């Protein structure tokens, strides 16, 4: 009894070069580059803590907006559409917009 074989030929696909630019440059860990971010902290662990603390402040800022309390400082860079607080914090660190003392 013979079984039908699937056609295994591949067809060439033409890629439109203008379609490649349809997507924005990714933000966050890939942009700004991690190597440039590491220049702003003594270690990768210090960078993680630094960025996480700032991301928490940004998140708390957004959460307090509805209450009318302005206890936290909002983003110091223009946030992108649906950009995460950690990505915003990374861009602020990269832009040297924050003052930071390690160990606090």
UniProtKB/Swiss-Prot annotation:
<keyword id="KW-0804">Transcription</keyword>
<dbReference type="Pfam" id="PF01192">
    <property type="entry name" value="RNA_pol_Rpb6"/>
</dbReference>
<keyword id="KW-0808">Transferase</keyword>
<comment type="subunit">
    <text>The RNAP catalytic core consists of 2 alpha, 1 beta, 1 beta' and 1 omega subunit. When a sigma factor is associated with the core the holoenzyme is formed, which can initiate transcription.</text>
</comment>
<keyword id="KW-0240">DNA-directed RNA polymerase</keyword>
<protein>
    <recommendedName>
        <fullName>DNA-directed RNA polymerase subunit omega</fullName>
        <ecNumber>2.7.7.6</ecNumber>
    </recommendedName>
</protein>
<dbReference type="GO" id="GO:0003899">
    <property type="term" value="F:DNA-directed RNA polymerase activity"/>
</dbReference>
<dbReference type="InterPro" id="IPR003716">
    <property type="entry name" value="DNA-dir_RNA_pol_omega"/>
</dbReference>
<dbReference type="GO" id="GO:0003677">
    <property type="term" value="F:DNA binding"/>
</dbReference>
<comment type="similarity">
    <text>Belongs to the RNA polymerase subunit omega family.</text>
</comment>
<dbReference type="GO" id="GO:0000428">
    <property type="term" value="C:DNA-directed RNA polymerase complex"/>
</dbReference>
<dbReference type="InterPro" id="IPR006110">
    <property type="entry name" value="Pol_omega/Rpo6/RPB6"/>
</dbReference>
<dbReference type="InterPro" id="IPR036161">
    <property type="entry name" value="RPB6/omega-like_sf"/>
</dbReference>
<keyword id="KW-0548">Nucleotidyltransferase</keyword>
<comment type="function">
    <text>Promotes RNA polymerase assembly. Latches the N- and C-terminal regions of the beta' subunit thereby facilitating its interaction with the beta and alpha subunits.</text>
</comment>
<dbReference type="GO" id="GO:0006351">
    <property type="term" value="P:DNA-templated transcription"/>
</dbReference>
